[in-house]
């Protein structure tokens, strides 16, 4: 067992493993892509105050300002976690969801309601449904109905903008191995970014098949 070890394709070549299972996860997609409106990416995503949820929680000294917008087009618990983190920091937070209800995939397990109640008790929290960011400015976001640009657009204050989109699979090692003709298998988010329990199930099945 090797813990806390970076491995690249060159190191894997020397291990002479009987089977290689790639479970390298995924990374945030930050190009402004919105699943509900793929032809209209968000403008202004290349600014310093536009970050991922990972950027948010891994840099506690980041200057966040007073107002934050969380843009959720994935529909899972990640957006709720980002909002709760920001509310606890004392920011006024607006959650913008492209869906017709808040984080629909988190509702499956009843995780959304208690989180909203906590955030409403802790501080300023606002929810906008069936909306998307069309453009990010220096201190605000231009928000409107999904796939209806120009219709009743709203300016939402935003010193920090957190984008929560479907992630990109991190499969570079797998692609190198396959190009060399070596057998390898993808599991978890490296195969298809989903909620955590699916990745756990993939790992469980892969381990059982090796026994």
Feature map (PLM): residue ranges:
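Conserved sugar-transfer catalytic core signal across GT-A, GT-B, and GT-C glycosyltransferases
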Residues: 82, 173, 199
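A polyampholytic, Gly/Pro-enriched intrinsically disordered region
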Residues: 68-71, 121, 146, 207-211
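Short, hinge-like loop/turn segments at secondary-structure boundaries
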Residues: 39-40, 111-114, 203-205
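A Rossmann-like FAD-binding core segment of flavoenzymes
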Residues: 1-30, 46, 52-58, 64, ...
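Short aromatic-enriched loop/helix-cap "lid" or pocket-rim segments at secondary-structure transitions
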Residues: 34-35, 107-109, 199
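Glycine-rich dinucleotide-binding loop and its adjacent helix/turn
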Residues: 1-2, 10, 29-89, 178-195
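An active-site-proximal "capping" alpha-helix that borders the catalytic cofactor pocket
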Residues: 197-211
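Predominant activation on well-ordered alpha-helical scaffold segments within soluble catalytic domains
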Residues: 84, 116, 174, 204-207
């Amino acid at each position: 067992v090797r813990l806390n070890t970076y491995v690249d394709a060159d190191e894997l070549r020397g291990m002479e493993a009987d089977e290689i299972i790639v479970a390298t996860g995924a990374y945030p997609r930050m190009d402004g892509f919105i699943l509900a409106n793929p032809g209209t990416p968000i403008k202004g995503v290349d600014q310093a105050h536009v970050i991922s949820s990972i950027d948010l929680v891994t840099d506690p000294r980041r200057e966040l300002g007073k107002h934050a917008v969380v843009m959720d087009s994935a529909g899972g618990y990640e957006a709720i976690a980002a909002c709760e983190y920001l509310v606890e920091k004392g920011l006024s937070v607006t959650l913008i969801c492209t869906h017709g209800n808040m984080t629909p995939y988190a509702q499956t397990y009843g995780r959304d309601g208690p989180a909203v109640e906590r955030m409403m008790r802790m501080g300023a929290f606002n929810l906008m449904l069936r909306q998307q960011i069309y453009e990010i400015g220096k201190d605000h976001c231009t928000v409107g109905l999904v796939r209806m640009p120009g219709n009743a657009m709203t300016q939402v204050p935003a010193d920090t903008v957190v984008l929560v989109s479907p992630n990109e699979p991190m499969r570079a090692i797998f692609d190198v191995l396959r190009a060399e003709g070596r057998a390898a298998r993808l599991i978890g988010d490296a195969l298809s970014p989903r909620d955590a329990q699916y990745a756990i199930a993939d790992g469980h099945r892969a381990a059982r098949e090796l026994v």
